[in-house]
Protein backbone atom coordinates (compact mmCIF):
# COMPACT_ATOMS: atom_id res chain seq x y z
CA UNK A 1 0.00 0.00 0.00
CA UNK A 2 2.82 2.39 0.88
CA UNK A 3 4.46 1.70 -2.49
CA UNK A 4 1.25 2.64 -4.31
CA UNK A 5 0.98 5.90 -2.39
CA UNK A 6 4.62 6.79 -3.08
CA UNK A 7 4.16 5.92 -6.76
CA UNK A 8 1.02 8.10 -7.00
CA UNK A 9 2.77 11.01 -5.28
CA UNK A 10 5.58 10.63 -7.80
CA UNK A 11 3.10 10.92 -10.70
CA UNK A 12 1.38 14.13 -9.54
CA UNK A 13 3.92 16.60 -11.01
CA UNK A 14 3.97 14.68 -14.30
CA UNK A 15 0.19 14.61 -14.60
CA UNK A 16 -0.11 18.41 -14.30
CA UNK A 17 2.71 18.81 -16.84
CA UNK A 18 0.97 16.39 -19.21
CA UNK A 19 -2.32 18.28 -18.89
CA UNK A 20 -0.54 21.59 -19.58
CA UNK A 21 1.19 20.14 -22.65
CA UNK A 22 -2.11 18.73 -23.93
CA UNK A 23 -3.72 22.18 -23.63
CA UNK A 24 -0.84 23.75 -25.57
CA UNK A 25 -1.11 21.12 -28.29
CA UNK A 26 -4.88 21.58 -28.51
CA UNK A 27 -4.82 25.37 -28.90
CA UNK A 28 -5.13 25.36 -32.66
CA UNK A 29 -7.79 22.67 -32.81
CA UNK A 30 -9.88 23.84 -29.85
CA UNK A 31 -13.60 23.93 -30.53
CA UNK A 32 -15.77 26.95 -29.80
CA UNK A 33 -17.18 25.16 -26.75
CA UNK A 34 -13.67 24.55 -25.41
CA UNK A 35 -12.76 28.18 -26.02
CA UNK A 36 -15.76 29.32 -23.99
CA UNK A 37 -14.53 27.14 -21.15
CA UNK A 38 -10.99 28.45 -21.50
CA UNK A 39 -12.23 32.04 -21.42
CA UNK A 40 -14.43 31.54 -18.38
CA UNK A 41 -11.97 29.46 -16.39
CA UNK A 42 -8.80 31.41 -17.25
CA UNK A 43 -6.54 32.12 -14.29
CA UNK A 44 -6.67 35.90 -14.51
CA UNK A 45 -4.48 36.37 -11.45
CA UNK A 46 -1.51 35.64 -13.70
CA UNK A 47 -2.36 38.48 -16.08
CA UNK A 48 -0.60 41.80 -16.04
CA UNK A 49 -1.93 45.16 -14.84
CA UNK A 50 -5.04 46.71 -16.43
CA UNK A 51 -6.70 43.32 -16.69
CA UNK A 52 -10.40 44.02 -17.04
CA UNK A 53 -11.34 40.34 -16.94
CA UNK A 54 -10.38 39.89 -13.27
CA UNK A 55 -13.95 40.62 -12.26
CA UNK A 56 -16.50 37.90 -12.89
CA UNK A 57 -19.29 40.49 -13.11
CA UNK A 58 -20.27 41.25 -16.74
CA UNK A 59 -21.52 44.70 -15.65
CA UNK A 60 -18.12 45.59 -14.18
CA UNK A 61 -16.36 44.38 -17.33
CA UNK A 62 -18.70 46.40 -19.58
CA UNK A 63 -18.20 49.47 -17.37
CA UNK A 64 -14.42 49.06 -17.56
CA UNK A 65 -14.60 48.79 -21.35
CA UNK A 66 -16.86 51.84 -21.59
CA UNK A 67 -14.42 53.97 -19.59
CA UNK A 68 -11.60 53.43 -22.08
CA UNK A 69 -11.33 56.31 -24.61
CA UNK A 70 -12.88 55.44 -27.99
CA UNK A 71 -13.98 52.12 -26.53
CA UNK A 72 -10.49 50.67 -26.91
CA UNK A 73 -8.13 49.15 -24.40
CA UNK A 74 -4.69 50.74 -24.42
CA UNK A 75 -2.08 48.93 -26.56
CA UNK A 76 -0.35 46.20 -24.61
CA UNK A 77 -3.25 45.59 -22.27
CA UNK A 78 -3.61 41.88 -21.61
CA UNK A 79 -6.98 40.23 -21.21
CA UNK A 80 -7.15 36.71 -19.84
CA UNK A 81 -8.56 34.22 -22.29
CA UNK A 82 -6.76 31.01 -21.42
CA UNK A 83 -5.25 30.67 -24.87
CA UNK A 84 -2.60 33.34 -24.58
CA UNK A 85 -3.97 35.69 -27.23
CA UNK A 86 -3.80 39.45 -27.03
CA UNK A 87 -7.16 41.17 -26.81
CA UNK A 88 -8.61 44.63 -27.12
CA UNK A 89 -12.08 46.13 -27.23
CA UNK A 90 -14.02 48.33 -29.59
CA UNK A 91 -17.57 49.50 -30.14
CA UNK A 92 -19.65 48.22 -33.02
CA UNK A 93 -21.86 50.39 -35.25
CA UNK A 94 -24.72 50.13 -32.73
CA UNK A 95 -22.56 51.43 -29.88
CA UNK A 96 -22.24 48.06 -28.14
CA UNK A 97 -18.87 47.28 -26.62
CA UNK A 98 -17.30 44.03 -27.78
CA UNK A 99 -13.95 42.43 -27.15
CA UNK A 100 -12.02 41.11 -30.13
CA UNK A 101 -9.50 38.37 -29.43
CA UNK A 102 -6.72 37.23 -31.72
CA UNK A 103 -5.64 33.59 -31.51
CA UNK A 104 -2.66 33.20 -33.85
CA UNK A 105 -4.37 32.79 -37.23
CA UNK A 106 -8.00 33.25 -36.12
CA UNK A 107 -9.98 35.96 -34.34
CA UNK A 108 -13.09 35.74 -32.17
CA UNK A 109 -15.55 38.30 -30.84
CA UNK A 110 -16.76 38.07 -27.27
CA UNK A 111 -20.57 38.15 -27.26
CA UNK A 112 -22.47 41.05 -25.70
CA UNK A 113 -23.41 38.95 -22.68
CA UNK A 114 -19.73 37.95 -22.29
CA UNK A 115 -20.78 34.30 -22.33
CA UNK A 116 -19.09 33.06 -25.47
CA UNK A 117 -16.91 33.65 -28.49
CA UNK A 118 -18.05 34.09 -32.07
CA UNK A 119 -15.55 33.18 -34.82
CA UNK A 120 -14.69 36.04 -37.21
CA UNK A 121 -13.29 35.76 -40.73
Give names to the regions the model predicted.
Residues 13-15:
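N-terminal signal peptide c-region/cleavage motif recognized by signal peptidases
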Residues 17-121:
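Mitochondrial intermembrane space
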Residues 2-8:
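Sec-dependent signal peptide recognition
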Amino acid sequence: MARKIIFLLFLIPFSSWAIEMKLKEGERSATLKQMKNFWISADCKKCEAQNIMESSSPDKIKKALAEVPDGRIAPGTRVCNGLGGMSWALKDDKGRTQSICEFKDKSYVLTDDLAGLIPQN
